[in-house]
Amino acid sequence: MVVSTAQAWAATRFHESGHAVVAFWCDVPIKGITVVADDAALGRVTHYPPGKWFRPDLGRAPRVLAQIDAHVRIGLAGKIAETINAESLPIKSRNWRANIRHGAEHDMSNVVDLASYRTSAVTEYLAWMEVEVKAMLEARWRQVTGLAIALGDQPVMTGDEARSALVAASRLSRATT
């Protein structure tokens, strides 16, 4: 079964929504989010730079380590959100796991690079972070879904617009539970 353009676009919306929701909950401000493909990616979440103090190559101060952890969580969140969504679909393409891995290669490269500043036990650290991020996303799945739906209507959002969509999804979540 070939993945349709609609399926790929939905997967991208969930992928980018995962990044944005985790960034929001890790207090990492985002500049914007898009699911409009360009030469480099199918979508992206952009962040403001952390500041000149963020030099993981020069030290392991607590705030540097916290920033590494936050950005590792954010980097893992896209693939994990896409996976959670794909697992919930009644019909899956034959190669759906490979499609997710392929789409997340750039994210994973960045995550491994950041993790290597944190610890020499990168594999174990990332396995722990994946469990943490999956739990974080599952607890906030309505926000992920709400933002993914909003991105279907508005494929390019500023950080403020994305935050508003997350707040609206949170209100809806509380109203229906």
List PLM regions with ranges.
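Soluble catalytic regions of large protease machineries
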Residues: V2-T177
